[in-house]
Design a protein with these regions (language model features):
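Start-transfer (signal-anchor) and selected internal transmembrane alpha helices
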Residues: 1-28, 114, 120, 199-202, ...
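Signature aromatic-anchored transmembrane alpha helix within multi-pass, membrane-resident enzymes
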Residues: 16-20, 208-211, 329-355
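Extracytosolic helix-loop segments that constitute the early lumenal/periplasmic catalytic or substrate-binding loops
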Residues: 46-69, 76-77
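Transmembrane-helix signature of polytopic, membrane-embedded enzymes
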Residues: 100, 104-132, 151-152, 168
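Membrane-interface transmembrane helices that cradle and orient dolichyl/undecaprenyl
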Residues: 117, 146-149, 154-168, 195-196
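Short acidic/glycine- and proline-prone juxtamembrane loop motifs at membrane-interface regions
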Residues: 139-147
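Perimembrane helix-loop-helix junctions
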Residues: 186-212
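Hydrophobic/aromatic-rich transmembrane helices and adjacent perimembrane loops
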Residues: 287-335
Length: 473
């Protein structure tokens, strides 16, 4: 008995070491990219500015995108990060938070799999399988997104539903719904599963709460900030919902051609293959991800059906828990083989796609000691902390903690600014209020055309071989 307890403890320590190692490695990796000017306004600087404004008790109107932070996405989960901004001035803190949130997503899967498979060793394997999944590591290096909390929170939702830990269930459901307005697409199917397999009343309430929260976020919160409830209707093919349903029923072959076009089959292959499709043995838990997978495949937005972007992370917990759930329902004599197959597939796809040590995929060279990076940071001192600034987009991620900062060519020429992301080209009314501009010494043709019209109103106050800082006359 003592030996068994010692073995269980060692496997748990191993999982904690695995999670800590992952979190520290990706913290180091992503902070290094940020310090090497590898981050940008989209999608890091805008969150850094918004949370910083909240930490100063100001309205989080993010000038890097021209929208309120909660009008862009209803990510009220970010309010829990605000206190960190009271105690640190590091612009890298969000990358550390994200890495630990993603790393901790392995813990609920370990807690469930060690019990469901009656093996701490298999629990350890599945904790590693989660961290090896390409959608986890690639989300970790894709700037910063509140979606990174969903690996942990949806994992806790599934663990608590499967184990009937109802207090944990409701806490994690509420927190998950605070991450983003469309999280209901995963929580509603989980609620339906709970209603059918665990507790009818709790499952129905999950669906009702999820639908109500989604309606509140779209129709009240986001509409009040941006004037529109749903800014991304352009992502629905065939002209919108009506056209999509019409094609689905009248021209199903056209819909099939669309769903098998571009990289969509490859995306599905990369998403599902790390599980060795073991969830097919009992697919009900894995199927809770079907709505999100379908939405990603249907979307006209290229990024949604690419494994390298954050849209896929929310799917991973359902696939992982579904895989364990499926394996737990086959005869014991086959379990080791199935777990072995999952481990091999995860290692293969982790090596192929995930930005892990010794893996095939890398994030490029973003060194803080690069002369151009050092030169940029030297010139930051020329710009006052309270100045209104327009800067080249990688620089905005370093300068975001101020009330007003714009990603050049904004506000001199609109680009990805305001509720309508397609509005572009006009000079915004407050362009004359910009006090400082920081640009590279060599501009592309479009940027040079914009700046040639504005530069007579500015003088050079700092420069080097790579960068120039201008101040309004």
């Amino acid at each position: 008995m003592l030996a068994v307890r010692r073995s269980k403890k060692l496997w748990s320590i191993g999982v904690l070491a695995l999670v800590l190692g992952y979190s520290l490695y990706f913290s180091w990796l992503t902070v290094g990219v940020h310090r090497g000017l590898g981050s940008s306004a989209y999608d890091f600087g805008l969150y850094d500015q918004g949370i910083w404004l909240l930490s100063r008790w100001q309205s989080p109107f993010v000038t890097l995108m021209g929208r309120n932070l909660f009008g862009d996405h209803s990510s009220f989960i970010l309010l829990f990060i605000v206190p960190i901004y009271w105690v640190t001035t590091s612009t890298s803190v969000l990358f550390v938070v994200q890495s630990f949130a993603l790393g901790f997503g392995a813990l609920p899967l370990y807690a469930y799999s060690r019990k469901a498979l009656n093996s701490d060793a298999m629990g350890f394997i599945f904790a590693a399988v989660y961290l090896l999944h390409p959608a986890v590591g690639l989300t970790n290096v894709e700037n910063f997104h509140p979606d990174s909390f969903l690996g942990l929170l949806i994992g806790v939702v599934l663990w608590s539903a499967l184990e009937r830990k109802w207090n944990w269930y409701w806490i994690s459901v509420v927190l998950a719904l605070l991450v983003k307005e469309d999280v209901a697409l995963i929580v509603i199917p989980i609620g339906l599963w709970v209603a059918l397999r665990r507790d009818l009343r709790r499952g129905v309430w999950t669906v009702v709460v999820s639908l109500g929260t989604m309606a509140l976020m779209f129709l009240v919160v986001m509409r009040s900030f941006t004037g529109v409830a749903f800014r991304n209707s352009w992502r629905i093919p065939f002209g919108g919902f009506a056209g999509l349903f019409r094609v689905a029923f009248r021209q199903p072959l056209e819909l099939w051609k669309y769903l098998t076009s571009d990289d969509r089959p490859t995306y599905l292959f990369q998403l599902l293959s790390p599980t060795a499709l073991a969830f097919i043995a009992a697919p009900s838990v894995a199927l809770t991800s079907a709505a999100v997978i379908g939405a990603n495949l249907i979307s006209t937005f290229w990024y949604q059906h690419q494994i390298g972007y954050h849209y896929s992370l929310v799917i991973v917990p359902s696939l992982m828990f579904g895989t364990v759930y499926g394996i737990a329902r086959v005869p014991i004599t086959y379990r080791k083989r199935m777990v072995g197959a999952v481990a091999v597939c995860s290692l293969a796809f982790g090596y192929w796609l995930s930005p892990l040590p010794l893996a095939r995929s890398t994030v490029g060279d973003w060194s803080a000691s690069n002369p151009s990076v050092v030169a940029a940071k030297e010139l930051f001192a020329v710009i006052p902390d309270d100045a209104v600034v327009s800067a080249y987009h990688p620089l905005t991620a370093q300068l975001a903690r101020r009330e007003r900062i714009y990603s050049f060519p904004n506000p001199f020429q609109r680009s990805l600014y305001g509720p309508d992301v397609f509005a572009r080209g006009d000079r915004l009314l407050f362009a004359e209020e910009v006090e400082y501009v920081m640009l590279p010494t060599v501009l592309d043709e479009a940027a040079n055309l914009v700046w040639s019209q504005e530069s007579p109103r500015f003088r050079v106050v700092g420069s080097n071989a790579w960068w120039i800082v201008y101040k309004r006359l």
